[in-house]
Amino acid sequence: MSEQLSDWRDEHLNKISCSFCAAKWLNVSLHLGHGFTNSCHLPLPHPIDVEAIKKNPAALHNTDFKKEIRKMMLEGVKPAECSYCWKIEDIGRNNISDRVYKSQIYSPEDIAALKELPWDADIIPQTMEVSFDRTCNFACSYCNSGYSTTWGKDIRDNGPYQKFKTTSAGAYYADGSWSEIYGKYNENNPYVDAFLKWWPELSQKLMEIRITGGEPSQSRNFWQFMDIMKQYPSPNLRLAVNSNLGLNETTVNRLISISHELDIKEFDLYTSCEAYGEQAEYIRDGLNYELWRSNLVKVIESAKI
């Protein structure tokens, strides 16, 4: 398997340059609540120019910073923000880094076409992850206030967590308000506005969009986006929604209805539960295990998935 991956890397990535990664062009994560983006989970997200997106919504993905990184990759320069991959490769032994796995999901033809484009060209991504805001009704133990309003409320009400034996626990001291710069309901958010403006074009070219949060079903922006998606048939698009499924009957029925109403290739719903009963409820504060299981069965039986 490793030999097959290294052969693929040499033929489709290293043929362009030793630092090339297709994810920097064809994948994007958009943190719309506070206006940040990245194209891989390893480099830290960077800010989106709010003035640029008013003129060109594609600047949500095609930031000046990201274009400079693409230029470096085309020229065989290894960007510092991608150091995780370089460390893996520098070990030797023909190690396979994440740039291979993150590029391999795209066709060789689409990857080869990237080297023919100007380094500063605006790219329509093929895969996208979007978080509209941090609104969430859970406070899971592995999460933090930057991704959950319930986490933030707990810290505001009870103060920051104490007596950590690590120096990297900053997320457990703050209430996460830094990620909610447009208020509780994310009104008049220029990043959301730009994304919705870009959607007619995206809807015809994206292969996959994943909606995460927070808890998407608790976000007004999520339901607004679902209404807009109905207006643009996307026969090649896969929609994936992350949900804790800790939902009341009205909301879970609404989610099921959406799966039937959208004209898309595929609707997938992702939910997680690491344990059973009380143990699960301890890990995911806010979880009612029986409700979660009931909703899961209902989605499996009734949704178009």
Residue ranges and their predicted role:
Residues 63, 67, 109-121, 187-200, ...:
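A Trp-anchored, charged/polar loop motif used as the substrate-binding/catalytic surface
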Residues 22-39, 117-146, 207-210:
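N-terminal pre-triad scaffold of radical SAM enzymes
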